[in-house]
Swiss-Prot record:
Pfam families: TCTP
Name of the protein described by the UniProt record: Translationally-controlled tumor protein homolog
Coiled-coil segments: none
Organism for this UniProt entry: Drosophila yakuba
Similarity-based family: Belongs to the TCTP family.
Amino acid sequence: MKIYKDIITGDEMFADTYKMKLVDEVIYEVYGKLITRQGDDIKLEGANASAEEADEGTDITSESGVDVVLNHRLQECFAFGDKKSYTLYLKDYMKKVLAKLEEKSPDQVDVFKTNMNKAMKDILGRFKELQFFTGESMDCDGMVALVEYREINGDSVPVLMFFKHGLDEEKC
């Protein structure tokens, strides 16, 4: 199994246990599921409750959300009220990633510069449909993951987007 961590904060962002796809060599799209967790029990949204065991009515806390977000303790970030504030963050973040890339993988710099501009124009065009999540440290200097709900086979599926070059792969 591989864990993907933010190269700036070291926060765990996601693992390769989810369905994922690399887009334009710069963005990982990770496909999540809406779940509800009660204590240690996980229930998929839309599951048939009548086919489950009888509930004993205990006071167990529950949390609902996207599995990737809950499992990796991502935190929703409300820092970007408009496109301009997100664009400013992105320019600053990309400079940090570029510096790390030049140091660790200089062969990837051209791929990053070329494809990232194209990908960002596409993402900024859908800005109003996005949610933003940081790693567990809630450090906005690091990666801010994007979540967009897409219609796939008649279902609304949460798709998380992470910048490939802003991640370190760690084998477990």
